[in-house]
């Protein structure tokens, strides 16, 4: 340290010492943070997928189940079509997913959560709205939209239902998701068969009626890779019965 015309100044040796002191403090702080992290258990994470739309009813209950046992858990959510979620499970990018059963599931294991009935959906002022239930033959002359191939399980259920009813409906018109369905039902006065849980998304201008006679249904399952030994997954699977009672 030296005293000059501009006051006290550090010498070269003093500046070097100060720099070393600053570095030592930074290293000490970093070591302290590392020690604190090491002393704390790793935060558990769980990657969970949902078929688009079903999370509204299931997620609150899933959240309660997991956080009761793992309070600090980080739940990483994904929402997509069932085929995309199944691929993510097979690639181990997801721990579990709520999906429709696919035809080729590979090394995935499924456990049924619930069975969703399909219902007829159409404009509120449609002629079918005067009925308590709708028979399949009553929509023969209507503009009918099918689910697209992006949702193969729903599409297959609808086609098989009409085949059993003896109706040869051709999938000339398709919709890709619930938002698209609402748009087509409203603008084209179309009729559709959709899972009952979609009722929660519909505006007042659209109504629903149950199917008369045999009711087509779709299973919702929780799927996971057979080699996944996660204790979080084990807990979730043990509470499937509780999830079955969640609002659909």
Regions found by a protein language model. Give the residues of each.
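Flexible hinge/capping segments at coil-to-helix
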Residues: 108-118, 122-144, 231-234
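Secondary-structure junction motif
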Residues: 143-165, 230-237, 247
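A short LG(V/I)-centered, amphipathic sequence patch enriched
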Residues: 1-12
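Short amphipathic alpha-helical coupling segments at ligand-binding clamshell hinges
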Residues: 13-20, 58, 62, 154-158, ...
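Hydrophobic hinge/microswitch elements
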Residues: 81-86, 90-94, 99-100, 150-209
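Central regulatory/effector-binding core of bacterial HTH transcription factors
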Residues: 43-105, 175
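Alpha-helical linker/hinge and terminal dimerization helices associated
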Residues: 17-39
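Beta-alpha-beta core module
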Residues: 106-112, 116-117, 138, 179-227
């Amino acid at each position: 340290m030296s005293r000059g015309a501009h006051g006290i100044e550090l010498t070269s040796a003093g500046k070097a010492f100060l720099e070393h002191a600053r570095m030592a403090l930074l290293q000490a702080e970093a070591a302290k943070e590392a020690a604190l992290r090491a002393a704390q258990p790793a935060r558990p994470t769980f990657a969970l997928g949902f078929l688009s739309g079903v999370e509204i009813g299931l997620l609150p209950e899933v959240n309660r189940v997991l956080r009761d046992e793992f309070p600090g858990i980080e739940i990483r959510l994904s929402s997509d079509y069932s085929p995309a979620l199944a691929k993510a499970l097979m690639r181990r990018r997801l721990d579990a997913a709520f999906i429709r059963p696919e035809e080729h599931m590979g090394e995935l294991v499924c456990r049924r959560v619930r069975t969703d009935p399909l219902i007829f959906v159409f404009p509120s002022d449609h002629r079918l709205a005067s009925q308590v239930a709708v028979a399949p033959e009553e929509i023969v002359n209507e503009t009918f939209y099918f689910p697209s191939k992006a949702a193969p399980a729903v599409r297959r259920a609808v086609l098989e239902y009409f085949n059993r009813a003896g109706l040869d409906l051709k999938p000339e018109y398709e919709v890709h998701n619930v938002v698209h369905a609402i748009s087509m039902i409203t603008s084209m006065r179309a009729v559709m068969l959709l899972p009952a849980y979609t009722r929660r998304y519909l505006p007042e201008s659209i109504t629903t009626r149950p199917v008369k006679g045999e009711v087509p249904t779709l299973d919702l399952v929780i799927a996971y890779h057979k080699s996944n030994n996660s204790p979080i997954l084990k807990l979730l699977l043990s509470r499937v019965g509780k999830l079955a009672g969640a609002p659909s």
